[in-house]
Amino acid sequence: MSDYFLLFIGTVLVNNFVLVKFLGLCPFMGVSNKIETAVGMSFATTFVLTLTAAVSYIVNKYILLPLDLVYLQTIGFILVIAVVVQFTEMVMHKTSPTLYRLLGIFLPLITTNCAILGLALLNINEDHDFVESIIYGFSAGVGFSLVLVVFSSMRERLAASDIPLPFKGGSIAMITAGLMSLAFMGFTGLIK
């Protein structure tokens, strides 16, 4: 049980997908202007990461490895991600049409989010079992959500602040992201 907790804390804080592994930077910068869209994107991405971790483990363990088709891992995982994202899009369209409209183009772009493919490949490389894969996927989503929501709230405050003209927009966003990354480096010694 403590191994699962350490995996969760390690993935959320120490090995954060956005600030340490630099995965998922496109939605991190693109959806972080308003906190409402950031929260919606966080839920959708966490759901997709968790479900993709489980399904990609099953596909790898019970289809690709027994049939000796390991060379098709990347293509297989891309197909799994596309199916999971389409499923998520249909569920969100039925349950929350407002959020579906707010996310707009970013929802289908989850398919091309490198964090999701990176998660599937890292699960295989780190030799996680089924439960560890699900925990790893969920904690990657929680870490992504934490960083995205905090960053979007900081960007909202920065938009209302008096910032020198050369630093407005993307410049101050990159500086803020760098400072957040430095702050998360403080968790490095937390898990060994």
From Swiss-Prot:
It is found in: Cell inner membrane. Its EC number is 7.-.-.-. The chain crosses the membrane at residues 5-25, 39-59, 63-83, 102-122, 134-154, 171-191. Keywords: Cell inner membrane, Cell membrane, Electron transport, Membrane, Translocase, Transmembrane, Transmembrane helix, Transport. It is a multi-pass membrane protein. It is an enzyme of class 7 (translocase). One of its GO terms (biological process) is electron transport chain. GO terms for cellular component: plasma membrane. It comes from the Bacteria. Part of a membrane-bound complex that couples electron transfer with translocation of ions across the membrane. The complex is composed of six subunits: RnfA, RnfB, RnfC, RnfD, RnfE and RnfG. Belongs to the NqrDE/RnfAE family. This is Ion-translocating oxidoreductase complex subunit A. The gene is rnfA.
